[in-house]
A protein has these predicted regions:
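Short, glycine/acidic-rich hinge or "gate" loops at secondary-structure transitions
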Residues: 97-101, 130-142, 296-307
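Internal, hydrophobic cores of structured domains that mediate oligomerization or house catalytic pockets
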Residues: 109-165
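Secondary-shell segments that build the walls of catalytic and ion/ligand-binding clefts
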Residues: 1-76, 149-297, 303-327
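Long, hydrophobic/aromatic-enriched structural stretches that serve as scaffold segments
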Residues: 59-132
Length: 327
């Protein structure tokens, strides 16, 4: 058997050092994402301040459909994103096998890349819904985005109805009556949303990569003050980084193998992909929370609405608040 050379030993030590450094950065960033969980768990108790920009977005708009049409539509995606980031943090912490830790030592690459894609896309949706400075457009996007959700829901109805049709005896059940009532209410909501669309400016609704790119482009134009990165607004800016991330992670989500072309050295490249994905997802989520809070707070007066987000986001909250006057 050939003995390892000095160069082999040096390369092994260097790789180990790189791995440890990357894992430390990944863990630190993932924990930042998990620090948003208290906000996600409690913000709905007092969603917005009276007199805030978001409160005025909601006031008198689509009240037959929901009392919080704009704020409520924007809230769910970022809560979904934070849940994914919390799972990422737990997954990364659980792999630590250094020292006395008895973690798996497994990168769980597919799981981490899938979760971070989910988080980034959901957080980007909140940014996209709220970033337009025109109240009429924010209202329009909330209505049209909700309508697009209902369009997707129709496929669920079709499969559910087919199941009941396949087993006619079930049509005497409480479950079938509840399903019919749900469809009736669904049809009513569709009509309400049609009226809402007639009352607001036209706007295109997209999802996935478009939303991620749109949110990242907005951040290039309005750099978050809590993030010292010099990436924003460059010729190759955050929009480009986010698009690259989304393409690669989407391939993993759909079971495609082409990302393996960019892992010639195996573990190190894999670890770098994970840390980049965590960075982008946490950045999107922090910015979504800050943008929501910039519009949810009444900055002209003191209120008893609790501050649930990390203090580090405050500079971005204050800077972006100026873009959304309540009146």
């Amino acid at each position: 058997m050939n003995q390892p050379t000095l160069a082999d030993l040096f390369a092994a030590v260097a790789n180990r050092a790189q791995r440890v450094e990357i894992l430390q950065r990944t863990n630190a960033k993932a924990k930042r994402g998990a620090e948003l969980k208290p906000w996600a768990m409690q913000v709905k108790r007092q969603l917005v301040d009276p007199g805030s920009s978001l409160a005025n977005d909601d006031d008198g708009f689509m009240t037959d459909y929901a009392g919080d049409m704009v704020s409520g539509t924007a809230l769910f995606p970022i809560i979904n994103a934070i849940d994914s980031l919390t799972a990422v943090s737990e997954l990364i912490d659980g792999r630590d096998d250094s020292g006395d830790r008895k973690g798996s030592g497994d990168h769980h690459t597919s799981s981490n890349l899938t979760l971070t894609r989910m988080a980034a896309e959901s957080a980007a949706t909140t940014i996209w819904l709220l970033s337009n400075p025109d109240r009429a457009m924010r209202r329009s996007l909330s209505v049209r985005f909700t309508a697009s959700e209902l369009n997707a829901q129709r496929a669920f109805h079709r499969s559910t109805r087919k199941r009941f049709d396949q087993y006619p005896d079930t049509k005497q059940s409480v479950a079938y009556r509840e399903f019919l009532e749900h469809v009736r209410l669904f049809d009513e909501r569709v009509e309400m949303l049609k009226q809402g669309m007639q009352q607001t400016p036209k706007a295109n609704v997209s999802d996935g990569g478009f939303v991620v790119a749109a949110a990242a482009k907005w951040l290039d134009q309005h750099p978050p003050q809590h993030d010292p990165s010099d990436l924003y607004g460059n010729a190759y800016g955050f929009e480009d980084v986010a698009a690259r991330f989304y393409n690669l992670n989407s391939a993993i989500v759909h079971g495609l193998k082409w990302p393996l072309d960019y892992m010639p050295n195996g573990e190190i490249q894999m670890a770098r992909m994970i840390v980049e994905s965590v960075n982008i997802a946490v950045t999107m989520a922090e910015c979504a929370v800050a943008l929501f809070e910039a519009q949810a707070q009444n900055h002209a007066t003191n209120t008893d609405r609790p501050i649930l987000y990390p203090d580090r986001l405050q500079p971005s909250v204050e800077t972006w608040a100026a873009l959304y006057p309540p009146d």
